[in-house]
Amino acid sequence: MTSETRTLYSQLPAIDRLLHDSAFLSLRDRYGHTQVVDLLRRMLDDARDVIRNTQTLPDWYADWAQEAKLRLENAAQSALRPVINLTGTVLHTNLGRALQAQEAIEAVTQAMRAPVTLEYDLDGAGRGHRDRALATLLCRITGAEDACIVNNNAAAVLLMLAATASGKEVVVSRGELVEIGGAFRIPDVMRQAGCTLHEVGTTNRTHAKDYRQAVNENTGLLMKVHTSNYSIEGFTKTVEEAELAEIGRELDIPVVADLGSGSLVDLSQYGLPKEPMPQQLIAAGVSLVSFSGDKLLGGPQAGIIVGKKAMIAQLQSHPLKRALRADKMTLAALEATLRLYLHPEALAEKLPTLRLLTRSEASIREQAQRLQARLAARYGDEFALEVKPCLSQIGSGSLPVDRLPSAAMTFTPHDGRGSRLEALAARWRMLPVPVIGRIYDGRLWLDMRCLEDESRFMEMMLK
């Protein structure tokens, strides 16, 4: 160690002296003695590293209290930070998928603040069932005999298979052996559920005779899986759910379906692409139908299974059901969301997912043009700002080939350097409320479809 290094080390303050500084007294009151002391020890270690590597004191040496304050504030931030989603993906899996309706938010708040009748029957003063209220609503909306709620649709598929076909074969078209995010594959789920996969047909063509020929004495289920996150086009043939249900009735084999996204309304009435609905499959005779709560339905993360009462009873009594059951906050939000579907005339206004998906290109473009001048005054020295047409996507594996006409504010660096776009995107991610866009074709795009809180957006962008 050189004499210069020793001199620099000697200038580092003692923790006890720092703790008696008035600024640190304030930090101790706010964050607690232990957190502040632990932080100061880390800061001293950091300072020693800087001295050892650079033979200089750290940049923040002159104001330890300010550096400590910044670090403590950063550490205190929630891991689930609110962001402004301008990626162009409405149901963005990495950003939490569906925004909740105000009614759902209020229902969750109430469920957290007070004891609730989660499994308590007020009429009989005894134990109730946590799925009962939602089952009643879901039966009213879908026409099913009964319903079951778990924590996500992957869990719903696992429970459906394990409870009704463990030790048996499940017949599925080869073209429907889907994989979703996180390497969740239908064949893997079947193995976990104790089922044997029996593939029929080919990737692009499966016929009714393929299902008939596959049935044997060990067949437990015929299964349809909606390919919600990809599309096979061209020379194709599939067996529709109604036809498969008829085959199931003839052969006395239950038919189950995994819809994935799942929509409880006909989206085409809003000018959106049509998606199969659970009520259609129930009417067609499918025994069990599973779908997600936090995708096109617009509620919290949940797996929903509707169908025949006897088969739902098998699910409810299976040991996996308790491991996969939804908590009171999920059930409260889902019930409030489902009640919105009882008033379909107001659904597009009250349900954020539907409200964002149905925004017109003209209204989005007008919004972008209205904000352009103020943003140009802030960023115009480095970037050319333009309002350009773009295509939003629904996201979360829903309607993968369909796009929604939209408008974006684009930022193009005057000097053409892509590094400026990366730096700008990084700067926006560091804002108190991060703004998330996407870089494409030499521009940074902010798709304005999901922008509802303009004042907060402009406050962040003009910092």
Curated annotation (Swiss-Prot):
Keywords: Cytoplasm, Protein biosynthesis, Pyridoxal phosphate, Selenium, Transferase. Pathway: Aminoacyl-tRNA biosynthesis; selenocysteinyl-tRNA(Sec) biosynthesis; selenocysteinyl-tRNA(Sec) from L-seryl-tRNA(Sec) (bacterial route): step 1/1. The modification N6-(pyridoxal phosphate)lysine is found at K295. One of its GO terms (biological process) is conversion of seryl-tRNAsec to selenocys-tRNAsec. GO terms for molecular function: L-seryl-tRNA(Sec) selenium transferase activity. Its EC number is 2.9.1.1. Gene3D superfamilies: 3.90.1150.180, Type I PLP-dependent aspartate aminotransferase-like (Major domain). It is an enzyme of class 2 (transferase). It comes from the Bacteria. This is L-seryl-tRNA(Sec) selenium transferase. It comes from Salmonella typhimurium (strain LT2 / SGSC1412 / ATCC 700720). The gene is selA.
